[in-house]
Design a protein with these regions (language model features):
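Aromatic sugar-binding surface patches on proteins
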Residues: 70-102
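Solvent-exposed loop/turn segments flanking beta-strands in beta-repeat/beta-sandwich domains
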Residues: 32-45, 52-61, 67
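Exposed beta-strand face motif in extracellular beta-rich ectodomains
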Residues: 25, 109-115
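Short, compositionally biased P/S/T/A/G/V-rich stretches that sit at domain boundaries
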Residues: 1-23, 135-144
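Beta-sandwich strand segments
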Residues: 123-133
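Extracellular acidic, Ser/Thr/Pro-rich low-complexity tracts
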Residues: 12-17, 27-38, 47-51, 119-121
């Protein structure tokens, strides 16, 4: 059996902070496998910047987790934001870094993105992809 992505939930529009703060946008995907949830190896997405015709994060997968938010993914205490472990809903809190960060790698790019989701099971079989389009807006209040 092949894994399935039943649904994907993410904002359609994200306003990037204008200062040096960071906000977190929760992304979820409900996955199903006829062999059971234990047969799902991973759920995740890649982020494609439409205007730049390029993948962000070096094209690497951004993993979603079905861990109930109990596992620290990055120190000191960053968790997935997943609500309930082992319920088939995989989650990740995507960091959105403000324009005021002096390190360019900590400034979230603005523009149109296709978030391309898929799931893979334990036999390395892939689900069909689901594409979610999101707009990251420049949120600079100094122009108002």
């Amino acid at each position: 059996f092949i894994p399935q992505l039943v649904s994907v939930s993410a904002s359609d529009t994200i306003s990037r902070p204008s200062d040096n703060s960071v906000i977190f946008e929760l992304v979820t995907a409900r996955a199903h496998d006829a062999n059971g949830l234990n047969d799902i190896r991973r759920v995740g997405f890649v982020s494609y910047h439409v205007e730049w015709d390029s993948f962000l994060n070096k094209g690497n997968l951004i993993n979603l987790y079905d861990d109930g938010g109990e596992v620290v993914i990055y120190e000191p205490n960053f968790t997935s934001g997943d609500l309930n472990a082992n319920d088939g809903i995989f989650s990740f809190r995507v960091p959105v870094f403000g324009a005021g960060n002096t390190d360019p790698s900590l400034q979230t790019k603005t523009g149109t993105f296709n978030w391309i989701f898929d799931a893979m099971d334990m036999s390395n079989t892939y689900s069909d992809t689901v594409i979610h389009r999101v707009i990251v807006e420049w949120n600079d209040l100094s122009y108002i």
